[in-house]
UniProtKB/Swiss-Prot annotation:
<comment type="function">
    <text>The globular domain of the protein is located near the polypeptide exit tunnel on the outside of the subunit, while an extended beta-hairpin is found that lines the wall of the exit tunnel in the center of the 70S ribosome.</text>
</comment>
<keyword id="KW-0150">Chloroplast</keyword>
<keyword id="KW-0699">rRNA-binding</keyword>
<dbReference type="GO" id="GO:0015934">
    <property type="term" value="C:large ribosomal subunit"/>
</dbReference>
<comment type="subunit">
    <text>Part of the 50S ribosomal subunit.</text>
</comment>
<comment type="similarity">
    <text>Belongs to the universal ribosomal protein uL22 family.</text>
</comment>
<dbReference type="InterPro" id="IPR005727">
    <property type="entry name" value="Ribosomal_uL22_bac/chlpt-type"/>
</dbReference>
<dbReference type="Pfam" id="PF00237">
    <property type="entry name" value="Ribosomal_L22"/>
</dbReference>
<dbReference type="GO" id="GO:0006412">
    <property type="term" value="P:translation"/>
</dbReference>
<keyword id="KW-0694">RNA-binding</keyword>
<comment type="function">
    <text>This protein binds specifically to 23S rRNA.</text>
</comment>
<dbReference type="GO" id="GO:0003735">
    <property type="term" value="F:structural constituent of ribosome"/>
</dbReference>
<keyword id="KW-0689">Ribosomal protein</keyword>
<keyword id="KW-0934">Plastid</keyword>
<dbReference type="InterPro" id="IPR001063">
    <property type="entry name" value="Ribosomal_uL22"/>
</dbReference>
<dbReference type="InterPro" id="IPR047867">
    <property type="entry name" value="Ribosomal_uL22_bac/org-type"/>
</dbReference>
<dbReference type="GO" id="GO:0019843">
    <property type="term" value="F:rRNA binding"/>
</dbReference>
Length: 125
């Protein structure tokens, strides 16, 4: 009989990242389901500005998994990754003739869930 051991999930959350959710989703869609080591390589080689905060978040989640739960980083993969819209920071830019122009700076919240690859073991009956 084959018994599947229950995987452990490690969750990391970054809030109020100063970029639009659409730009962060472009990167997150590329790494969803990849292994931890493959994810780091993808994020280092992609030319987008959103890669750096996502790289830091994935690295932090793996460090939490190894330190707090004692998991090996080589066994981790990204089981869930999502980007939600955050608050919109509103500023006013002065314009000519005493007018002002609104500047809207979007933010986003990024959630990364790392899981351990399931191990299959043979159980004696």
């Amino acid at each position: 009989m084959i018994k599947k051991t229950q995987g452990t999930e490690i969750r990391a959350l970054a809030r109020h990242i100063g970029m639009s959710a659409q730009k962060a989703r472009r990167v997150i869609d590329q790494i969803r389901g990849c292994s931890y080591e493959q994810t780091l390589m993808i994020l280092e080689l992609m030319p987008y500005r959103a890669c750096y905060p996502i790289f830091k978040l994935v690295y932090s989640a793996a460090a939490n998994a190894s330190h707090n739960r004692g998991l090996k980083e080589a066994d981790l993969f990204i089981s869930k990754a999502e980007v939600n819209e955050g608050v919109i920071v509103k500023r006013l830019k002065p314009q000519a003739r005493g007018r002002s122009y609104p500047i809207k700076r979007p933010t986003c919240h990024i959630t990364i869930v790392l899981s351990e690859r399931p191990n299959f073991t043979l159980k004696n009956i």
